[in-house]
Amino acid sequence: MKRPSGRAADQLRSIRITRNYTKHAEGSVLVEFGDTKVICTASIETGVPRFLKGQGQGWLTAEYGMLPRATGERNQREAARGKQGGRTLEIQRLIGRSLRAALDMSKLGENTLYIDCDVIQADGGTRTASITGAMVAVIDALKVLKKRGGLKGGDPVKQMIAAVSVGIYQGEPVLDLDYLEDSAAETDLNVVMTDAGGFIEVQGTAEGAPFHADELNAMLALAHDGVRQLFELQRAALAD
């Protein structure tokens, strides 16, 4: 089996995490997984949704979108269509769920973190890149909130999270699929993990033949190794 990119089966694409990418957001990151590029911002607003008012805890919610020409052919903006597509809703819910699992909401105070992930170029793995980049943006935003005196109960970050795709391509498990691989893969998994090795979410679909337990275990092992490398890159970015 030869991957279109020439990478080894267990090799990530070139990953870059650039902090403070935009001027106004409390936290902002440009995250690049190969040719996939996503701007992730974390904005802080005082107040929480109605169902949380008076409970002394915060909230995090996420939105996801793609520029019209992030892909090979132009797609109409969802705003122009008047509604978000099912894929968009699924991905932004995944991003929100994953990031909430990283935080202790009781330490946020009654503040809301708004996460915006905007894909400026897509070449596979946009949701996993979004989660990985947004985690760094969240940490930067929380530093700003702390300086403002908005954190009363210590650091809300319980654990780091990152995400990566794995799949079965030409009969073999591979890590971090690009678009060419993703579109031809027999199986595609998106895996969100903590830096302690726990799983937050595993999304998997067999596009062709069903996959078996040994293949699933092989893919999860690849994901574990890939996410470990992503945590190292996140920490290196935060140390700059």
From Swiss-Prot:
CDD domains named among the record's database cross-references: RNase_PH_bact
Positions with a binding annotation for phosphate: 87, 125-127
UniProt KW Transcription keyword: no
Reaction equations catalysed: tRNA(n+1) + phosphate = tRNA(n) + a ribonucleoside 5'-diphosphate
Molecular function, one GO term: tRNA nucleotidyltransferase activity
Pfam families found in the cross-reference section: RNase_PH (PF01138), RNase_PH_C (PF03725)
EC number: 2.7.7.56
Family annotation (InterPro entries): ExoRNase_PH_dom1, ExoRNase_PH_dom2, ExoRNase_PH_dom2_sf, PNPase/RNase_PH_dom_sf, Ribosomal_Su5_D2-typ_SF, RNase_PH, RNase_PH_bac-type, RNase_PH_CS
Function: Phosphorolytic 3'-5' exoribonuclease that plays an important role in tRNA 3'-end maturation. Removes nucleotide residues following the 3'-CCA terminus of tRNAs; can also add nucleotides to the ends of RNA molecules by using nucleoside diphosphates as substrates, but this may not be physiologically important. Probably plays a role in initiation of 16S rRNA degradation (leading to ribosome degradation) during starvation.
NCBIfam families per the UniProt record, alphabetical: RNasePH
Family recorded in the similarity comment: Belongs to the RNase PH family.
Listed HAMAP family: RNase_PH
Protein name: Ribonuclease PH
Gene: rph
